[in-house]
Amino acid sequence: MSDDILKAFNDQITLELTADMTYRQLAIEADAQDLSGMAAWLRHQADEEIVHANKFIDHTLDRGSHPRIGTIEAPEVEVGLSALEIFQAALAHEEKAVSYTHLT
């Protein structure tokens, strides 16, 4: 695997794990407001991001390269968001992630 491709895969792995943490933090916010259905949906989204990261990790390892996870900062999620604001935050994060994926 070329260095450029490995870097792109490493960046994508980090992005997927960042998305996991963002969805989990949003799920915590939903749970804190007794929005259990919303929280469950957000946790499911977080779990999917872990699956995505693992696929990139496995693909990289299968090709004899060594994946590296980059720096993951704590998600910036405000306390007290409304249900609408939680979904808007999830959508904004997903749009950012998709735009990054299409640019690399």
Where are these regions (language model features)?
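All-alpha RGS (Regulator of G-protein Signaling) helical domain and cognate RGS-like helical scaffolds
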Residues: 9-13, 33-35
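Acidic/His metal-coordination segments adjacent to aromatic residues that form catalytic metal sites
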Residues: 1-6, 71-92
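Short, contiguous, pocket-lining structural segments
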Residues: 1, 11-18
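Residue-level signal for short amphipathic helical patches enriched in basic/charged
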Residues: 30-33, 93
